[in-house]
Amino acid sequence: MPNKVFNVAVFFVVFRECLEAVIVISVLLSFLKQAIGEHDRALYRKLRIQVWVGVLLGFIICLAIGAGFIGAYYSLQKDIFGSAEDLWEGIFCMIATIMISMMGIPMLRMNKMQSKWRVKIARSLVEIPHRKRDYFKIGFLSRRYAMFLLPFITVLREGLEAVVFVAGAGITTQGSHASAYPLPVVVGLICGGLVGYLLYYGASKSSLQIFLILSTSILYLISAGLFSRGAWYFENYRFNLASGGDASEGGDGNGSYNIRKAVYHVNCCNPELDNGWDIFNALLGWQNTGYLSSMLCYNIYWLVLIIVLSLMIFEERRGHLPFTKNLQLKHLNPGYWIKNKKKQELTEEQKRQLFAKMENINFNEDGEINVQENYELPEQTTSHSSSQNVATDKEVLHVKADSL
């Protein structure tokens, strides 16, 4: 019954994706309040409307795509899977595990996520393209309708990611129905919006951090369960091929599982047959039959997660991975080199100049952004006070970044 009304995995996935979108929205609204505020109430209202129109339009598009995708899946499910349903379920579980694992850790790094988006928003507002073809990119087009395009693109991107993640997490939930999607999506959006509200109005960071830690822990419990269930589905698929039928149709007793690969089996608590146990299946990956592969996968997942988090803590304190001087975790990601992100990284001085230039942004009557193109930072006057000035600059940068 629960998986017919509320899919727990879908809720946490939607909440995570909504979280990053509301961070961008809160940063933009804070920037407008600081840059315009009480100086021009009419322009302030106009730009705020641009922000919310962009959010609403991006959300409607994602909602339509997600509804169409889920509706098509459940209407064509039997035709797509046929007798290989367990095989596809296992594949979906593994894919969902990877995606959910990657999205969980950033929830613990709320401050870094906010800083990342402050820099992205600042660059998109103040940088000018040097090539003609770049004038059609978001960085330049955002000059005219920046307060519309930035939230629209962000909500659209996060929403499309959510559609993919929800498909992976929801489809792999035992006994899940299409009716189990609307409620967790709505509740996830409400919770994400509530966190954004607390960020905008400056709620206690400690209480917010506790909430995010609990949410991330539950998210990883779901992910570990998905990984274990993926291995279980593969074992069940092999057993069905050998037995020539669907093992679940045999109930809980003999003939319903592969006794040669099973570590334990209980003749009850079947998530496919007994109401209530499907909740534990969705949250923890519970099965009444424990295969060696599924149990190993569950424990290996937590072992790998502990190692990764330990490396991140070490890197946070030392600035590099153990036994190396210049290697960080991001350097192990192939996307870092494929996308050439090294050239896009900014030094602290470049960030200081970027935020200083952002301080000179103003809006005309049409809401178009104007930037002083020839603005330069004042140079240091004496070498004797250079170290004090650098420290002061870092404090100013920190204050400016927090004020956004």
Swiss-Prot record:
The chain crosses the membrane at residues 8-28, 51-71, 87-107, 147-167, 183-203, 207-227, 294-314. It is found in: Membrane. InterPro entries: EfeU/FTR1-like, FTR1/Fip1/EfeU. Disulfide bonds: none annotated. It holds the Pfam family FTR1. Coiled coil: none annotated. One of its GO terms (biological process) is arsenate ion transmembrane transport. Permease for high affinity iron uptake. Present with 8370 molecules/cell in log phase SD medium. This is Plasma membrane iron permease.
